Amino acid sequence: MNDYYDAVIVGAGIAGVSAARTIRELNADMSILLVNGEDRLPYKRTKVSKHIRTGYQKDEFALYPSEWYEQQGIELLSGELATDIDRQEHTVAFKGGGSVRYGKLLLSTGSEPLFPKVVRPHESDSFFVVRHAKDGERLLKSAQRAKTVLISGMGVLSVELASELSAMGKDVTLIGATAQLIPKQLNLRASEILEDLLSRKKVKLFFQEEILSFEQNKKRRMSVQMIRRSGNYDMVVICIGVQPRLELATRAGLETNRGIRVNEYLQTSDADIYCAGDAAEHPNGYVTHLWHAAEYQGVLAGKNIAGEPAKHDYPPFRLKAEVFNTYFFSVNKPWNPLDYEIEEFEEGERYWALFYKNGVLSGMVMVNDRDRAQEFERAVREGWSREQVHRTFAFA
C-alpha cells in the first residue's frame, strides 16, 4: 500500500466498485485504493438471500475476479476497516493500523440493519440478520438444525428468506408491523397475490405484529412475546429495514441527517469528500436502498472524482424478487396512488398495475411478465404515453 492515492474509496459494494471502474475508464493515470471491509472479493450482495437454501462458495457472487483489479490498476485492500478521517491532513486511518493520504475520498459505506427497540446489536448471538455474505453463511449453518423460524419484517429480504427457508422444509412464520407485504414497492393487489402464494406454501403470516421480547429458554429455543401472540422458535431472523452507516462521517464532522448529506454532484459538506449509495442523503431528502440506484450513484461519483462533472438526476430504478418461482417487479411505485390514474390488468398468473401522471406513465408494478421487465422499466424512465404503452404491450 502506498502513502498517497489520488482517489481513496471506502466501501467495496456496488457503489464503490462502480466508482473505481468509472474513474479508471476516464483516467488511466489516477491512483485508486478501494477499501473492502469484508474477507472476500467485492460481490453482489442481493444474491445472498436468494441462495440460502443452496449455499454458496466464498467468491461465488464476486463482481469481478481478483485479476480484474490488478489489470485495472485498482489496489484492493480487503479485510480492513477505515476508522477515522482527518480532513485537514487528507488522511484516512485504518483499524489495523496505518493511514493513507487522499486527493479525493469517496464514502460508499452502505447501510446496516435496523433492530427492534427490544433488541440490542451486541445481543447478536440471539438472532440472525442477513446483510453480508457472512450473515448468510451463519444463518445457513444454524438452519440445518432448525425446524421453526420466525422472521420479523415484511420487506423484500424477509419474503425472499421465507421462500428459501420454507423450501428447505422449515416451519416459517413471517410477522411485520405493516398491513401488507412489501408495501414500499408493491401495490395492494400485487401484495395480495404474494400473500396468497406464501399462504399456499404454508408460510404463516401475521400483519401489524411486532416482537416485544425474546429470550432463550431451557430447551435452547427462543421464547418470543409479540403484541397478540407468543411462541417458541429455533431461530429468529430480524429484517425490519436498514439505516445508513454514518459513524465515519460523523466523526469527521461531515453534515449528516438521515444519511450523509450530499449535493447534486454527490459532494459532502467537504468538497474533497464524496458519498454514494445507501449512505448518501440527497438534496431532496432521498435515501436509496436499491442496488441499481447505488450502482448509478457510484458511476456519477466516479465521473466527478475524475474531473468530469455529472449531476444526479434521480432516474427511477426497478426492484425485482422471485418467490417460489413467481416473479415480482416494481419501478417507481407512487407513495400516494390516489394522485395518479391507475390501470390494472390481470391474466391468469400475470398482473400489471400502471400509474399515470398527466397522461404519462410514471410507475408500474408487475407479476410474472419477466421477459418484458426491461422494456417496462424503459417505458417508465422515458415517460411513455398511455397510447404508446397500450400499443407496445398490447393491453386491452
Located regions from the model:
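Rossmann-like dinucleotide-binding cores of NAD(P)H-dependent redox enzymes
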Residues: A62, T148, V156-S213, H312-F328
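Mid-to-C-terminal Rossmann-like scaffold of FAD/NAD(P)H-dependent oxidoreductases
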Residues: N2-Y5, A12, E25, A279-Q374
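C-terminal catalytic lobe of FAD-dependent flavoproteins
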Residues: M222, Y233-E255, F329-A396
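Glycine-rich dinucleotide-binding loop and its adjacent helix/turn
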Residues: T109-M168
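Short hydrophobic core segments
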Residues: V10, V100-G110, Y233-G241, G298
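FAD-site-proximal beta/loop scaffold in flavoenzymes
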Residues: E123-Q144, S223, S230-L300
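Beta1-alpha1 glycine-rich phosphate/pyrophosphate-binding loop at the start
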Residues: N2-E75, E164-Q185
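A conserved short coil-to-beta-strand element within the FAD-binding core of flavoproteins
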Residues: G79-E89, F207-K219
